[in-house]
Structures are given as C-alpha cells and as structure tokens.
Amino acid sequence: MTIPDLIALANARLANLTAQRTSAASLGDAVRMAQLDTEIAETEATLAALRGLS
C-alpha cells in the first residue's frame, strides 16, 4: 500500500468513527462516546503522521 492509500483508509475510518460518535451521542451513551473520542484522536494523529510522510 502507498501512503496516499493509507491516508484514504484513515480518512474513511475517521468518517465512520465520527458517524458512530454522532449515533452514540444521540443515544446518550457517554461511555461509547468517550471510547470513540479516543479512537478519533488516535486516527487524527495517524493521519497527521501520514500526511507528514507524503
């Protein structure tokens, strides 16, 4: 896989995580929201690192 491919996958993951967080928020699931916030932050950090390589 190339760096642009990995960036595309990370962007897709970020979009999915954001949608899941919106759903968890509408259900009032604070625990799941916190988990997703962590995953979103990790994915954003990965994206930043990948963008630094490209």
Protein language model features and the residues they cover:
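Short amphipathic alpha-helical heptad-repeat segments
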Residues: 3-20, 39
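Short, charged, amphipathic alpha-helical segments
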Residues: 8, 30-41
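Generic leucine side-chain signal with a strong bias for well-ordered alpha-helical environments
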Residues: 14-17, 36, 47-50
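Amphipathic alpha-helical coiled-coil segments
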Residues: 33, 41-54
